[in-house]
Structures are given as C-alpha cells and as structure tokens.
C-alpha cells in the first residue's frame, strides 16, 4: 500500500512539474503555444456548449467498438496459432503481412469499400487492435515453460486440462500487454480516421480547429485523448494486477 501511494504521489508530482513547465514556456514566450489557463478556459467553453461531451462519446464509441472486437478475435486466434502448428503455419504469415501495413494506410480503401459511415472507422480500429493483441497472445503461448507442460503430462493431465490450467494462466501477462498496446493503437487510429472522414469526434474537432488556427481547441482535444487513454490504461493495469496475483513484481 505504501509503495502504491508513493507511486501515485510521484505520478501527481510528475504531472505538476509538466504543467508548470508548460506554463513557464508559454508565459515567457519561449514557445508560441496556448498556456494551461487558455486551454482550460476553452475546455470549459466546449463543455458548456456540449461539443466536448459529444466528441468524447463519438470517439469513445468508435474506440471501444473496434477495440473490443479486435481483442475478442485476437485472443482465440493467438491461442490457436500458439497451440497448433498447422494453424500457426496457415495464419502467422498473414498476420505478419498485415502488421507491416500501417492501419492508417487502409483508411482510404476502407472508405471506398465500406462507405463513409462508422464502418470504415471501426474497421481500421479493429485491425490495429487485433494485430497488436494477436501477436502478444501467440507469443505468450509459445513462451510457456515446457517444463510445466511436461510435468502436467507426467501427472496424467490431458491436453484440454493443460491448456486451461497451464497455458492460459501463463499467457495472461502477455495477453494484457498486447491489450494495452492495442488500446494505444486504437486511440491513434481513431484520431487519424476522424481527421479524414468524420462529422464528430476529437480528431474531427482538431481538424476543424486547424483550419482556423484555433490552437486552444486542438490542445483541448489532445489533452482529452491523453486523459481518456491514461484512464483506460490504468483500468487495464488494475485488471492485470488482479488476474496475475501469482506473479512476482518488482
């Protein structure tokens, strides 16, 4: 508990130093950017007129839809690749092939084939989340200590039991790392997708603000994305601690 409180205190101190440095740089004219006070005032304005809330819900809906779908498919596919050599040989080359293609490069194709509604945005987020999570899950399965598997077999455990009692628990830390990486990819992708084709969302708001050189609004969207992403990542970290209590931690 003391270590956790110390960590929280250091987190808050780090944020305070960062905001203080931002304020000093803008107040002294060292950089031509809006200061924290300007950004806060614009955030209040956008909150009161409902724009910020609407943009948050629009982006969150897209991120969660694509992210959940991507992770839900990535985990079983990753286990399949790691557990069965035939499945690995069939699927792994395609996964690596599509990993080399940035999801952002797929956006124009997705718009042409899926239209200009929510489908192309959710699809590219799904793709980014899937590719991040499937590799981590696959790596988790093949990284399981063979001694544990052999010991279970010596004790008479069947493949199904070994998979459920050995492979899955040992792979959970890898899976959660992949999920966290996938979350970051989802946020990066949704912003890019909204910059290209959207009528709402934090990325769309930044694109509109850029046309009028409205830097405070751009900063509001950037800070909001950072806060939302940080909060969601902390939730995943809490899930990680709960699901991997058996694991030694530094």
Swiss-Prot record:
| Keyword tRNA-binding annotated | no
Q: Which Pfam families match?
A: BPD_transp_1
Family in the record? Belongs to the binding-protein-dependent transport system permease family.
Q: Name one GO biological process term.
A: transmembrane transport
Q: Where are the transmembrane segments?
A: 12-32, 63-83, 94-114, 122-142, 172-192, 211-231
Question: What membrane topology term does the record carry?
Answer: Multi-pass membrane protein
Source species = Brucella abortus (strain 2308)
Q: Which domain of life is it from?
A: Bacteria
Q: Which InterPro entries match?
A: MetI-like, MetI-like_sf
For this entry, the protein name equals Probable ABC transporter permease protein BAB2_1148
Q: What is its main location?
A: membrane
| Keyword Plastid part of the UniProt annotation | no
